Swiss-Prot record:
The PRC barrel domain binds ribosomal protein uS19. Gene3D superfamilies: PRC-barrel domain, RimM. It comes from Sinorhizobium fredii (strain NBRC 101917 / NGR234). It is found in: Cytoplasm. The lineage of its organism: Bacteria, Pseudomonadati, Pseudomonadota, Alphaproteobacteria, Hyphomicrobiales. GO terms for biological process: ribosomal small subunit biogenesis; rRNA processing. PANTHER family: RIBOSOME MATURATION FACTOR RIMM (PTHR33692:SF1). Residues 95-178 form the PRC barrel domain. This is Ribosome maturation factor RimM. The keyword ATP-binding does not apply. NCBIfam families: 16S_RimM. Keywords: Chaperone, Cytoplasm, Ribosome biogenesis, rRNA processing. Belongs to the RimM family.
Amino acid sequence: MTKLENPVLMATIGAAQGLRGEVRVKSFTDDPTALGDYGNLHSEDGRVFEVLEVRETKNVVIVRFRGINDRSAAEALNGLELFIERDNLPDDDLDEDEFFYADLEGLEAVDGTGKSYGSVTGVFDFGAGDLLELKGPGRRPVLIPFTEWSVLEIDLEAGKLLVDPVAAGLVEDKDESLDKQFPTKRK
């Protein structure tokens, strides 16, 4: 049983599929059928899973793992999250403006004056675009859009994100707040 130093979530196992130990898997990889290309997958409890076969369906992939040979063994895996070591991800395949979610977590979000708005504690995609979760000491978590207008620059080496606090919704736009205080009347 191996504990990963820098785990990256790759997939979540769903329901069993058929009688031969196959499972439905929600893959978080760019190409869902490439799930096995990153090496063995690991669970948080230290189990190791070798992918033998992957086939694509409409919303998930169907996966067969070594040692999971019947439906009851497959059913026992339902809800299990699978990880790989961060070093197994191919950095050279990324464009200049592409990042792995795992690389963004822990970066400090600062504005142009150096004011900190917290650190990235999560990256989410609920369907309308990526969101970064920021959490600072003594602050509640806040979600900001991960867009070129909100996040102006990413410096992985310095561990910082340069954000526009107005575009990110972290502060109120002074011009808009004046409009709210003195609404115009319509005739």
